[in-house]
Amino acid sequence: MILQNKTFDLNPNDIAGLELVCQTLRNRILEVVSANGGHLSSSLGAVELIVSMHALFDCQKNPFIFDTSHQAYAHKLLTGRFESFSTLRQFQGLSGFTKPSESAYDYFIAGHSSTSVSIGVGVAKAFCLKQALGMPIALLGDGSISAGIFYEALNELGDRKYPMIMILNDNEMSISTPIGALSKALSQLMKGPFYQSFRSKVKKILSTLPESVNYLASRFEESFKLITPGVFFEELGINYIGPINGHDLSAIIETLKLAKELKEPVLIHAQTLKGKGYKIAEGRYEKWHGVGPFDLDTGLSKKSKSAILSPTEAYSNTLLELAKKDEKIVGVTAAMPSGTGLDKLIDAYPLRFFDVAIAEQHALTSSSAMAKEGFKPFVSIYSTFLQRAYDSIVHDACISSLPIKLAIDRAGIVGEDGETHQGLLDVSYLRSIPNMVIFAPRDNETLKNAVRFANEHDSSPCAFRYPRGSFALKEGVFEPSGFVLGQSELLKKEGEILLIGYGNGVGRAHLVQLALKEKNIECALLDLRFLKPIDSNLSAIIAPYQKLYVFSDNYKLGGVASAILEFLSEQNILKPVKSFEIIDEFIMHGNTALVEKSLGLDTESLTDAILKDLGQER
């Protein structure tokens, strides 16, 4: 759906009017996010910046590019989606990120960090070639500047001098504490001997002036302070303005006017407060970055915490248990210590934990080097972000067969974050790489055993995946067993057809097994466990069964059924195999159960499909 109409007239000369608009937007964001969940604190903090952008620029002539775009809620509200905003992150509702198919005002799809400047450079090149008026305007957070792609784009932009405005929304906090030398270097400039000596001399001179002009000392000091952090960007050929107050509409608008007139690359450094306007969230950065539904008055979650551990918790608890006994274990993550559960390792063993910032490629390559030196790096990473490091996996880990351990969180359909965050690709691209061992647990107990197996596996890289939230298989349905390289586990032998589950697909297959049993159809159930190497005894295991049905939460192309069919082909075995994996399209956002139902992957739909394949009807 394309939403064309705007709902607000924004006069850059009417600051009081713009302040009312900002308050209206904040109220709406709080109203909807408290009901639906979403990215709250960054969206609240960026309101004045976005209102100012819209007040001065036509975003269809000057494309607005939102880095990651989780902070773009105010933009959505200003571009015809005020009423429909109530459907934010809901199935078939508005996306939580910018999405061109949703609105003509959303220039580019976003969800992963640090791409905005690169996109902007591409737009600027195209505008130059077309001799088009206008310039790209990128809004990016301080966490975004820790990624290599930001510097790659900045390097070209500074050299070619394309007209472009970048607004650095500096709220002093990305999802977790910002990591890296740049932010430290900028702050060190303020503390360096040249700056300190110069400031001391200036203050000494100004102190001799009459008291009536003493205010000059503080004003001069502040002015010098504003110039200093820009040295880094100025040396790259980027005009730097700031820091400015990112909640002062007058200051933002005047600065944007100046940047517009320069017709060169400009970085505006705006300091904001995450959670601005909602006292409970102000200053509590990580807790309020991404939230579920909550009570607006108290800030308390509307969802009670499950007594069952999440897969992330089961993983992190086991890793911590092993780390107590094995000093060679180290934890590595790319700006997601809390999300991946590695924050527990930070607290217990800070010297053995490495947050490399938004630098997935560096995470994998540096981990490979640690593995070469005899350490056991557990790289804890979301499936959707692992794809950013594919070359490092191939070139730096697998060619030399270095035993890094990839703990792939949020594998499968993740729900409300949608296309940019679904964890559906890792199975297909990892199984194409020589020397990679790939396996998956079916529940929390086997996940713990997967971590133990990975810790002991020292001959090659290995990867194991687990879902967000919870496994489909309830705890205790099957006795947990340890992992043995390349061995599957036949959980139920009796039946004429065989249901094969991989990872979270075991739980899905088990539910179908129970549903078919009610139809007097007995099914055997196999937990494949290892995708690579696949069980060499698989041909004997499947021999008694007429048909095979494969369940796994990854893309069908290059997926689990493909691996099984390749194996059978090499063995010259003809056996009907039907895949219940994900179809070849990007999967929309929404409640996971509703998304699965729309794909025909709920228990009822799967049961009907098998009945139909068997020539029976429900």
Protein language model features and the residues they cover:
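Extended, hydrophobic alpha-helical segments in both membrane/secreted and soluble proteins
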Residues: P136, L140-A153, G341, F353, ...
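Cofactor-/ligand-binding subdomain signature composed of acidic, glycine-rich
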Residues: M1-V32, I280-L296
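Cofactor-binding active-site loop characterized by glycine-rich and histidine/acidic residues
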Residues: L18, C22, E31, L40-R160, ...
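Conserved short loop/turn motifs at secondary-structure junctions
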Residues: A35-H39, L140-S144, G242-L249, I381-L386, ...
